[in-house]
Curated annotation (Swiss-Prot):
It comes from Nepenthes x ventrata (Red tropical pitcher plant). Disulfide bonds join C52-C98, C219-C224, C358-C379. It catalyses: Hydrolysis of Pro-|-Xaa >> Ala-|-Xaa in oligopeptides. Keywords: Disulfide bond, Glycoprotein, Hydrolase, Protease, Secreted, Signal, Zymogen. Residues 1-24 form the signal peptide. Residues 25-128 form a propeptide. It is an enzyme of class 3 (hydrolase). Glycans are attached at N68, N145, N152, N253. Changing W175A: Abolishes activity. Weakly inhibited by the aspartic protease inhibitor pepstatin. Weakly inhibited by pepstatin A (IC(50) of 140 uM) and 1,2-epoxy-3-(p-nitrophenoxy)propane (EPNP) (IC(50) of 480 uM). Activity is not affected by the POP inhibitor Z-Pro-prolinal inhibitor or the denaturant urea. InterPro entries: Glutamic_endopeptidase (IPR053168), Neprosin (IPR004314), Neprosin_propep (IPR025521). This is Protein neprosin.
């Protein structure tokens, strides 16, 4: 796909916000019991409940492979691209913060609805079909010998509409992976609108992982043992401010990098260390990744293969509308074997949009970097 060349101005990337009360857009839900190790509970004005959990009693350490794990508080090194940003203030911070030695865990919401198992848009071995309930507009960068050491992404945030809020989801994320089939290992992070899982229609930051191709390992956020959080400020699952069509644009900045000393994969949000996926829970990705993917995914719970759903991806507008109207991902960067940050050119990526009349993608060259515009209104 030939890139289009133009120049545009980035709107302010200020992340402090006051989100309206979530109740008006919530589905029937109740809160789970507080997790073990809770030393303090904070309730936001929007109804959000966050438990401050002893860092050594967090869910990760219930994983059988982490019984004797030594907590790593900071990465031993990081690539030079990780920058410094203003911290995102979350609504519950108005009523307190978690003390040092604890981590904030968003109280799990129980909706009584099944959580859909994720799928992987494996462009390398088995590209997604247009006849599935998962639809994608995704690009991938392949790197031989499973030696990629990380990737970056700055993701435009939106609040897409879902045809069936009780079952559909829409997300934008970065996938870092190695292996295939039952040996597929993934590290995933981005934003998602999924009322059936979170209890409301707000875009929320999420993480995900699997060590066996989504068969029996892995989960969203901290709902199962795996990801080790070290940061006492950011609550995984936090609500994010969505962009305005033709107006203010908001972004999620994230970086995932492997620590060469320990093999742990570290997550940074807006330049701040949040925690890591331990090397010991994986098998294929312990030394590096072979693929990085960026883009959007929707799930159509109606079982029509995505062709008859109006569930939106990204902003709900096609990528041809451009900045301020179509959703984008920038900072399309990887960390190579030697720890160097590389910025692949448009022709270095493989992309796929199985239902391009519903969701599509295109590259556009900004004044200083490449942008991936993606998404769409669904199949009308």
């Amino acid at each position: 796909m030939q890139a289009k060349f133009f120049t545009f101005v980035i709107l302010s990337s200020v992340f402090y916000f006051n989100y309206p009360l979530a109740e008006a857009r919530s589905i029937q839900a109740r809160l789970a019991n507080k997790p073990k190790g809770t030393i303090k509970t904070i309730k936001g004005d929007d109804g959000e409940v966050v438990d401050c959990v002893d860092i050594y009693k967090q869910p990760a350490f219930d994983h059988p492979l982490l019984k004797n794990h030594t907590l790593q508080m900071q990465p031993s090194s990081y690539a030079s691209k990780v920058g410094e940003y203003n911290k995102l203030e979350q609504p519950w911070h108005k009523n307190g913060e978690c003390p040092k030695g604890s981590i904030p865990i968003r109280r799990q919401v129980i909706t009584g609805l099944p959580v859909v198992k994720k799928q992987f848009p494996n462009l390398k071995f088995a590209p997604p079909s247009a006849n599935t309930n998962h639809q994608y507009a995704v690009i991938a960068y392949f790197y031989g010998n499973a030696s990629l050491q990380g990737a970056n992404a700055t993701i435009n945030i939106w609040e897409p509409n879902l045809k069936n809020p009780n079952g559909d989801f829409s997300l934008t994320q970065i996938w870092i992976s190695a292996g295939s089939g039952s040996s597929l290992n993934t590290i995933e992070a981005g934003w998602q609108v999924y009322p059936g899982r979170t209890g409301d229609s707000q875009p929320r930051f999420f993480i995900y992982w699997t060590a066996d191709g989504y068969t029996s390992t892995g989960c969203y956020d901290l709902t199962c043992p795996g990801f080790v959080q070290t940061n006492n400020y950011y609550a995984i699952g936090m609500a994010l401010q969505p962009s305005v069509y033709g107006g203010q644009q908001y972004e999620l900045n994230e970086s995932i990098q492997r620590d060469p000393a320990t093999g742990n994969w570290w997550l940074y949000l807006w330049g701040t260390v949040v925690g890591y996926w331990p090397a010991s829970i994986y098998n294929s990705i312990t030394n590096g990744a072979d693929t990085v993917e960026w883009g959007g995914e929707i799930y159509d719970s109606s079982g029509t293969g995505g062709f008859h759903t109006t569930t939106q991806m990204g902003s709900g507008h096609f990528p041809t509308e451009g900045y301020g109207k179509a959703s984008y991902v920038r900072d399309l960067q990887c960390v190579d074997t030697y720890g160097n940050v590389i910025s692949p050119t448009a022709n270095s990526f493989q992309g796929i949009a199985p239902a391009p009349n519903c969701y599509n993608y295109q590259f556009q060259q900004g004044s200083s970097e490449l942008y991936l515009f993606y998404g769409g209104p669904g199949c009308q």
